[in-house]
């Protein structure tokens, strides 16, 4: 497996371009299955999960053309196979997203239960109950979800008992072609959900209320072609801002959406960063200062994203003072703590709370990535450590960060990838 070798102690300085958001790209690629005409999607990040979903579409007989700039044209009318097989689905939980659009457009779907991250339980029950409420017959046998409907799905009022991003997206896609109106209550409000709604509306859908906790979908008989650019990745943006902050540096992130990062920027200002924003850029300057410890609690958007928790923990490792981090979204999401402590961190975990006491200096060590955001946090910690850190199992990083070592090198980091 590839490794990253990082020599810490360099102050980051420079400008980088932010990639398209993986968490918007995946549902949008799934939603191409709803259209009766070819659709084009641009600004896709060049990531393993995106490639896997494109491969899944191709395996099902969907006509996919991709250029060297990651613009994809998809024509779902050529679909031959309504099954998403285990060997592709096992690596990525987002593959469950093809269930809603397939049953809505083609009347049936068979999707293997997904794999992906190792963090906690992510039940798909909400997706299945919602589809049943819209008239689908659902059977789970031998690890596959088999869904079918006679005619069209029917609009329904669906109250989700917990806020779920993929659940909201799956049901929103299914409802786009249903007969009648669907109301999704307790819906996820994430910008990626809004981007998916914008994409469906560009194809002729009638979705309103995306970005609030009640989404209204008036079903239409067919969806047509369109061109759509995926929104910028707010988590990638936040990760690079923290990487600059931990080194006392300066960074300008370009082609991003500052309005999607209010909770993150507020905490960075608390840590002592000077933040300036424009329409599509954010500049952070630590002016060589050591960060101050911050306390935070993860919660659904627009609050602090769980996907930024590990990165803020890394910042706290070398900060002045003590910060407390409470994880409310996923269980078992402190797997990076053990690895950070190998670098000389002082972290104590009590249930879903981590208490981080800042130390003067971290020391480079061999560490192992356990999930996507944990691996990014280990890279951030390594940038501030003295000596050399080796981060193993970085296939986790490659699932969510496009060219991470190249972007960090352009900011002055000493980092290289060593192939297995």
Swiss-Prot record:
The active site is at 117 (proton donor). It is found in: Cytoplasm. UDP-N-acetyl-alpha-D-glucosamine binds at residues 93, 307, 329. The modification 2-(S-cysteinyl)pyruvic acid O-phosphothioketal is found at residue 117. HAMAP family: MurA. It comes from Alcanivorax borkumensis (strain ATCC 700651 / DSM 11573 / NCIMB 13689 / SK2). Keywords: Cell cycle, Cell division, Cell shape, Cell wall biogenesis/degradation, Cytoplasm, Peptidoglycan synthesis, Pyruvate, Transferase. GO terms for molecular function: UDP-N-acetylglucosamine 1-carboxyvinyltransferase activity. NCBIfam families: murA, PRK09369.1. Cell wall formation. Adds enolpyruvyl to UDP-N-acetylglucosamine. Disulfide bonds: none annotated. The gene is murA. GO terms for biological process: cell division; cell wall organization; peptidoglycan biosynthetic process; regulation of cell shape; UDP-N-acetylgalactosamine biosynthetic process. GO terms for cellular component: cytoplasm. Pathway: Cell wall biogenesis; peptidoglycan biosynthesis. Its EC number is 2.5.1.7. Phosphoenolpyruvate binds at residues 22-23. The keyword Cytoplasm applies. Belongs to the EPSP synthase family. MurA subfamily. This is UDP-N-acetylglucosamine 1-carboxyvinyltransferase. It catalyses: phosphoenolpyruvate + UDP-N-acetyl-alpha-D-glucosamine = UDP-N-acetyl-3-O-(1-carboxyvinyl)-alpha-D-glucosamine + phosphate.
């Amino acid at each position: 497996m590839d490794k990253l070798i990082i020599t810490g102690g360099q102050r980051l300085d420079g400008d980088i371009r932010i990639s398209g958001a993986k968490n918007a790209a995946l549902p949008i690629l799934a939603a191409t299955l709803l259209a009766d005409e070819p659709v084009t999607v641009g600004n896709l990040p060049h990531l393993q999960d995106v490639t896997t979903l494109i491969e899944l579409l191709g395996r099902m007989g969907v006509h996919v053309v991709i250029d060297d700039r990651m613009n994809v044209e998809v024509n779902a009318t050529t679909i031959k196979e309504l099954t998403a097989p285990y060997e592709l689905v096992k690596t990525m939980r987002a593959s469950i997203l093809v269930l809603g659009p397939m049953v809505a457009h083609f009347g049936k779907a068979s999707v293997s239960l997904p794999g992906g991250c190792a963090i906690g339980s992510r039940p798909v029950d909400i997706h299945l109950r919602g589809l049943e409420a819209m008239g689908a017959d659902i059977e789970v046998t031998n690890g596959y979800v088999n869904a079918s409907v006679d005619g069209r799905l029917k609009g329904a009022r669906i109250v989700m008992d917990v806020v779920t991003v993929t659940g909201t997206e799956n049901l929103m896609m299914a409802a786009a072609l249903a007969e009648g109106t669907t109301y999704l209550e307790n819906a996820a409000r994430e910008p990626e959900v809004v981007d998916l709604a914008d994409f469906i509306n560009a194809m002729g859908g009638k979705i309103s209320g995306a970005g609030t906790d009640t989404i209204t979908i008036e079903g239409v008989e067919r969806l047509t072609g369109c061109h759509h650019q995926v929104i910028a990745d707010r988590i990638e943006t936040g990760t690079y801002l923290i990487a600059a902050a931990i080194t006392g540096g300066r960074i300008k992130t370009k082609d991003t959406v500052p309005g999607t990062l209010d909770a993150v920027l507020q905490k960075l200002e608390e840590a002592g960063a000077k933040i300036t924003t424009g329409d599509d850029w954010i500049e952070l300057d630590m002016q060589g200062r050591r960060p101050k410890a911050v306390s935070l609690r993860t919660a659904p958007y627009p609050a602090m994203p769980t996907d930024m928790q590990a990165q803020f923990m890394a910042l706290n490792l070398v900060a002045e003072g003590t910060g407390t981090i409470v994880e409310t979204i996923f269980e078992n999401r402190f797997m990076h703590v053990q690895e950070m402590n190998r670098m000389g961190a002082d972290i104590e975990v009590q249930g879903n709370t981590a208490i981080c006491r800042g130390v003067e200096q971290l020391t480079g060590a061999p560490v192992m990535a356990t999930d996507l955001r944990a691996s990014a946090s280990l890279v951030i910690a390594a940038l501030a450590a003295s000596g050399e850190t080796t981060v193993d199992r970085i296939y986790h990083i490659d699932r969510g960060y496009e060219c991470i070592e190249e972007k960090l090198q352009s900011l002055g980091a000493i980092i290289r990838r060593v192939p297995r």
